[in-house]
């Protein structure tokens, strides 16, 4: 049995887990981010997924994680130590990423954003804007030399849809889809239009303004749970890479084994 690498991206909404053999992503699953869920519960879910994929737990003794949810960081460390006899490498201070962070306070930058930057720096060299669409949508900018120079943070598309439903008396919760037309013929279709096409406007305008400040048209890479859906209605992206964060974790793990 060949050794495999487990890459775990713990976000506010979901936990993205990838299994690598070398550079090949063999399997990819998403679990809900539930701070109250016990390590035993997550272990049971993961072991079931591994069994279904035909992957033996004994092969998984290399693990790397990044997290924006501290309680779940602890939970998943326990999962891998107790059930896989593996001590995860957690992306944070002291971990090599290859990314020079040029921010007022580098420690403020989320681990997931550094991981995305590490992936883009290797996979798509040169000036780059990474648009990661999840609970929040982040716009991360790399210089021509691959340094992380900042960006922007906006509410995610699902977060926006949830907020308008919760903060109004009569507007319902909606499914986020790509509408056939902009002019909605009822309340739901009007909301879907406003959320979807309005969000495309937000993304495109922020990308253009970042490029204007940089003084050049850069490569734009989209990732995150809503990347493919937004890319259906926009030509602003050069690359759509849903597994960018997992690839960044793989790259950082290899970098820290040298």
Swiss-Prot record:
Active site per database record: 112
GO cellular component: cytoplasm
Native source organism of the sequence: Dehalococcoides mccartyi (strain ATCC BAA-2266 / KCTC 15142 / 195)
Assembly notes: Homodimer.
GO molecular function terms noted in the UniProt entry: ATP binding; metal ion binding; pantothenate kinase activity
Originating gene: coaX
Subcellular location: Cytoplasm
Pathway this chain belongs to: Cofactor biosynthesis; coenzyme A biosynthesis; CoA from (R)-pantothenate: step 1/5
InterPro entries: ATPase_NBD, Type_III_PanK
Cofactor note: A monovalent cation. Ammonium or potassium.
Enzyme class: transferase
Residues annotated to bind ATP: 9-16, 135
Catalytic activity: (R)-pantothenate + ATP = (R)-4'-phosphopantothenate + ADP + H(+)
Biological processes, Gene Ontology terms: coenzyme A biosynthetic process
Cofactor dependency: NH4(+); K(+)
Similarity comment: family membership: Belongs to the type III pantothenate kinase family.
NCBIfam families for the chain: baf (TIGR00671), PRK13318.1-6 (NF009848), PRK13321.1 (NF009855)
Binding site for K(+): 132
Keywords, alphabetical: ATP-binding, Coenzyme A biosynthesis, Cytoplasm, Kinase, Metal-binding, Nucleotide-binding, Potassium, Transferase
Name recorded for this polypeptide: Type III pantothenate kinase
PANTHER family tied to this protein: TYPE III PANTOTHENATE KINASE
């Amino acid at each position: 049995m060949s050794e495999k690498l487990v890459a775990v991206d713990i976000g506010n909404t979901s936990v993205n887990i990838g299994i690598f053999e070398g550079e090949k992503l063999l399997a990819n699953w998403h679990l809900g981010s539930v701070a109250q869920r016990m390590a035993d519960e997550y272990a049971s879910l993961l072991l079931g997924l591994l069994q279904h994929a035909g992957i033996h737990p004994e092969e998984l003794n290399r693990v790397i994680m990044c997290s924006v949810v501290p309680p779940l960081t602890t939970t998943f460390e326990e999962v891998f130590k107790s059930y896989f006899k593996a001590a995860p490498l957690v992306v944070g201070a002291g971990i090599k990423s290859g990314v020079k962070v040029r921010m007022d306070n580098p420690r403020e930058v989320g681990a997931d954003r550094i991981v995305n930057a590490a992936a883009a720096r290797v996979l798509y060299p040169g000036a780059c804007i990474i648009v990661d669409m999840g609970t929040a949508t982040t716009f991360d900018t790399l210089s021509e030399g691959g340094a992380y120079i900042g960006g922007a943070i906006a509410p995610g598309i699902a977060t926006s849809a949830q907020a308008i439903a919760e903060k109004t008396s009569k507007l319902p919760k909606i499914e986020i889809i790509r509408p056939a037309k902009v002019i909605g013929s009822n309340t739901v279709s009007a909301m879907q239009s406003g959320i979807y096409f309005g969000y495309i406007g937000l993304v495109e305008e922020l990308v253009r303004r970042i490029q204007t400040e940089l003084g050049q048209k850069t490569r734009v890479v989209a990732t995150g749970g809503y990347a493919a859906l937004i890319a259906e209605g926009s030509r602003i992206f050069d690359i759509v890479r849903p597994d960018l964060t997992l690839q960044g974790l793989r790259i950082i793990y290899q970098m820290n084994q040298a």
